[in-house]
Amino acid sequence: MEKQDKLYMSIYNDFYGGLLTDYQSRLISMYYDEDMSLAEIVKECGISPQGVRDALIRAEKTLTTMESKLGLVKKTLEMKRLLLEFEKVATDEQKKEIKQALAILEE
């Protein structure tokens, strides 16, 4: 998986991780956010390599399905891009409001 794909999987987990089981969300976090290898996850969780791999695949599929149906990550990134573009031509007062909007999107 390419670096950008790994970044997106981490973002998907931030957005949709609450819809996964705690176990699946934790595995995604360990693999993508903490950059742990499968062997390290196996050791940490005490399950088989195949069990870890299967759980990761199911979680990845769930996350990508959620994004393809809801598109929240795509929409949020597009809103950020548009706000940053608008900020370039905005007045000082508008820039304050844009910064507030960007802060809300970061939450």
Name what the model sees in each region.
Residues 4-17:
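Short, Lys/Arg-enriched N-terminal segment that forms or immediately precedes the first helix
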Residues 22-34:
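Short amphipathic alpha helix immediately N-terminal
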Residues 31, 56, 63, 67:
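DNA major-groove recognition helix of helix-turn-helix
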Residues 48-49:
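Helix-turn-helix DNA-binding motif, specifically the short coil turn and the N-cap/start of the second
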Residues 64-78:
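Short Lys/Arg-enriched helix C-cap and helix-to-coil transition segments
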